[in-house]
Amino acid sequence: MQNSSLFEVMLRRVLIMQIYETIRETIPSGALELSAIVVTLHDAKKRRKKMMQSIRSCVLPLAMLTGGVFYGFFSRFSTAIPYFIFTMLLLTFCKLAPKDVKFKKLHLWLILIQILGSIAVYLIVSLFDTVTAQGAFICILAPTAMAAAVITGMLGGNVAFLTSYVLVSNIGTALAAPVIFSFMGPNTEMPFTDSFIYICREVMPLLILPLLAAWTIRAAAPPLHRALLKINPVTFYLWAFSLTIVTGRTVKFLSEQQNPDYTTEISLAAIALAICLAQFKAGKYIGNRYGERIAAGQGLGQKNTILAIWMSQMYLNPVASVGPASYVLWQNIVNSYQLWIKKNRDDKCASSHEARKK
């Protein structure tokens, strides 16, 4: 019995060794090939992502440079800007489900700062220069950028809160802008009622209808809604082309001025920088009290500058558009700095974690 048992044990060992050798000889080659393919695909994906990030980082200066150099050509397309804004908002709101919209007290504080702050700054700066005051005003009144939710996510903030504020911000601007614009710019020459109705007819549909259209499509035509979600990346290219057009229109107006006032233009760029930094700081300060430091900072600081430039060119002194045009650059520098800080912090945390492991 003992010999039989010993024989069975030895036989099992031999069989196990044979199976092991077979696996080692046959599978590794295929496994290595498969592993190599997986690694290659992963590396290719990482390289593609880095390449896209590099391309996107170059699009801002390239779009502004192209619009500035070829302003005569691109300024001809300025009538298309409202349609581009509508399309970008529609695609953005397609990602926002009604059930995800949750209003909080902080949303109210932020929209009050956005609307009342813009009026207060205008009244103060207008004591020195009206055009500079208009540029400062529009940099604050402009609604939150559609891309702010993306940056908020990259910084580790509450994307749901910020997405809800994009909605609040657009509705607030749509309601406030017609009233405020009626008291400044060329619209002051018209009776208030006529001016209000005229601006309402252009601004409110541009900001409200995309939301209504997106939610109607979501409920009534799910296949179309899914198709719109798939082409959502198109918003980036629409934004780039829109930036080229509004830059071209701004440069065209400035170059055709009979009596250019470079002091005003420099003042507009400088005050846009001050307002940009102040809005990011104020948003973070008040947001910190509600546990939404990052999201509130982006909500107040990152603006829909395409819309701001278009509104200033349509309803204010066109020179005032230098303010939001400069704001494009300032807010992107701030965002780049914030992302760099976040990356360095994450790298340090990862390094210290690895060190503790060792």
Predicted regions and their residues:
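N-terminal polybasic/positive-inside topogenic patches
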Residues: 13-19, 41
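Short hydrophobic alpha-helical segments enriched in small aliphatic residues
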Residues: 8, 21, 36, 43-44
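Low-complexity, intrinsically disordered segments with a bias for serine/threonine
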Residues: 8-9, 33, 39, 355-356
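Alpha-helical transmembrane segments of multi-pass small-molecule/ion transporters
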Residues: 41-358
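N-terminal amphipathic/hydrophobic targeting modules at extreme N-termini
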Residues: 3-6, 12-13
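N-terminal start and proteolytic maturation junction detector
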Residues: 9, 25-26
